[in-house]
Amino acid sequence: HGLDAITGVGEAEGVRSVVVLGYRGVQALDVVGPCDVFTAATGVLRGQGREDGYAVSVVSRGGAPIATGTGLELAARPLPDPRRPVDTLVLPGGFGVDEARSDPELIGWLRLAAEHARRTVSVCTGAFLAAQAGLVDGCAVTTHWAFADRLAAEFASVTVDPNPIFVRSSDRVWTAAGVTAGIDLALALVEDDVGTDVAQTIARWLVMYLRRPGGQTQFAAPQLRSPLGISPGQYRKTFA
């Protein structure tokens, strides 16, 4: 089904196309986490004798291999026609996000693709891509706690809340907090699409909460320090 998301998005009846945007320096878990949730959902649904599910494709400029920030290289397909309907467009974060959002052609593709997507989802600093494309003007969003102040400073029209694990920013846009929060959001989207039983089955398989208790400030506190014991400024310098 992966090819369906490129050559004919959503052509298989009942299958929801998921297109994940990759770029140099993307955070690997921001890509792989949601992909694992959506593909697991398809497996659960097949086990129930259902034909619906998700067709997941990772795409990049020119279909070039994606060098992630952790050194893993991901295979990718070329960017699909942005005018073709997509169910879910996923915008991951990573230390390469500034380079990606400074690419006017990529942002132009993103803006048009989002117009034809049922929903657009950002993970971690992928919120900067969404903001750069004007997808969250006047909306409340979240991002990785260490980058919330920077996002708010750069995009005055966006209200940034550093606490939630994810936010439904508008009727068509969702934003998730840092890194693993993309898994939480993907589970919520699956639950919204096909029900709690499927989402709960996936959560058990992944050995995680279906609904994580608390927000992300519990991981930043006290004094907004990162898990590595460094300040947000040092964190950004190291990982952004």
Predicted regions and their residues:
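Membrane-embedded alpha-helical core segments of multi-pass
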Residues: 90-91, 159, 181-182
